[in-house]
């Protein structure tokens, strides 16, 4: 009687965790990531010093920036870091809160898994709680007037008060509000505030931080192509191109064979004539002062544009910069010089000038009429300071944008989290069966934000949290009471003027709860061998004799 040999479906080098073990590993990984950024919450937060792979130093207390630099191996930890990135891209703020909340909510689940409560029951309770949280948060939102610049500055100031740049007063706040108002575009009910595309930050080391400014136009790191061209032009006529100003080369390789010297001269003459026609007839027909192109400009073209039109030419500009210039000057980017019309010329720019800052030349297009794009010029002592200020400015821009898109606020300082925790605890009494327990656990997990704020400024956590719970005991009575992040005492957030945009808070709560539910539903983690080893594994498999029974399907399929 022949016994059948065991068949291994998975590669023997693959590591596999299943069931409870996988879920516990995920919870531990998530908790480890949240512990890294826990001390960076609030105005008394600590900074983290990180060494990047290139040997540079990153000094920051921005949750996303910290996690971006950290190299982790566990897949659950990687998904937590992805949370911070998603939060940062979506609303620009709340990256630390979302990680701390997700870690705490997952920790609260561990005891239920030990009692053999099925993850699906917990996930169902969490989604039910999330619906209630969104409804309550919406009802607590207070509308504001975004036309009042003073109010807008107060809100942005309270949101970035925890950052490194808060030491310079309202400087970053003013820059953010001015930049967002510049790129704000409303057509009927449609509101567009594309900060990422149309508000460019230019960092130039040197000078004082107080010299930072939002330009009423744009700047870019380019100089003129010819030393004889003008570097200061008032009310310039601007032409933008997306094509090279040189003799057209064939799409494929082209060989030319000359038998007589005259033929070669004739070919050169034709080349020069074509460039002359392109410049003198097509471009100078619309009488431009400044010609900017994304591609190259030949010496011949520079000569003709300078000789016949006294034009200033800038070449090889980035497409993103070209789009910003089009927004501030009112010009249309042309793909072919012969297509240029009078309506394509930009006339909204009041001043074009080239300045030397440090060792580099920068082109400025300022005094623009109602610009819908801007450049933010940041000056500072060192690159480290500039990088941290830029991260803070990114958060401030995100907050200002969120408030203008959805002009509603909720109290900060952990007040809204404590209010939601108390209301969810009351709501859980109406729920019957096993789902009541995860509901209560989620309510308890929300308290992590005020608790962490109190911990980070060295307060008596137990006493402060008891006082805060007492304030929030009755519905809406203590809604505005939170933790003063500087003193660690409880305070009315209206007096402290600490507010959060409702969109940031809702996104934080949604992201953390949904991510928790996703990680809870994982019951199997398979980590195979690395890609570079797969080729070797496949070859070894091919050399085996017929008698070897091991089958490794997983590692040979993708070669």
UniProtKB/Swiss-Prot annotation:
SUPFAM superfamilies: GroEL apical domain-like, GroEL equatorial domain-like, GroEL-intermediate domain like
Pfam family, one: Cpn60_TCP1
Disulfide bonds: 368-374
CDD domains: TCP1_gamma (cd03337)
Intracellular or extracellular location(s): Cytoplasm
Keywords, sorted A to Z: ATP-binding, Chaperone, Cytoplasm, Disulfide bond, Nucleotide-binding
Entry's Gene Ontology cellular component terms: chaperonin-containing T-complex
Family indicated by similarity: Belongs to the TCP-1 chaperonin family.
Entry protein name: T-complex protein 1 subunit gamma
Organism of provenance: Oxytricha granulifera (Ciliate)
